[in-house]
Swiss-Prot record:
PANTHER family: LARGE RIBOSOMAL SUBUNIT PROTEIN BL27M (PTHR15893:SF0), RIBOSOMAL PROTEIN L27 (PTHR15893). This is Large ribosomal subunit protein bL27. Belongs to the bacterial ribosomal protein bL27 family. InterPro entries: Ribosomal_bL27 (IPR001684). It comes from Desulfovibrio desulfuricans (strain ATCC 27774 / DSM 6949 / MB). GO terms for cellular component: cytosolic large ribosomal subunit. The keyword Metal-binding does not apply.
């Protein structure tokens, strides 16, 4: 016979999968219209010129171009804004 007592059960051992948020296209990268730039919860990064925002706060490019991030001050807070500038062909 096996000489092992029954082990207790644990209430741990679960973990949810990550939601893959974050910056998807960085400053200086070329993007196409519709490309996702940032996936976020709330407005960590604000939309700038030629950037749209989806209803889940996803930022996306409205035109083909180059990504540029910018810090700016509003009400004594430093915020981040992302722009897409038209690429010179």
């Amino acid at each position: 016979m096996a000489q092992k007592k029954a082990g207790g059960s644990s209430r741990n051992g679960r973990d949810s999968v990550g939601q893959r948020r974050g910056v998807k296209r960085f400053g200086g990268q070329r993007v196409l219209a519709g490309n996702i730039l940032v996936r976020q919860l709330g407005t960590t990064v604000h939309p700038g010129v030629n950037v749209g925002m989806g209803r889940d706060f996803t930022l996306f490019a409205k035109i083909d171009g180059v990504v540029r991030f910018e810090k700016y001050i509003r009400k004594r807070r430093v915020l981040t804004r992302v722009h897409v500038e038209a690429a010179a062909s």
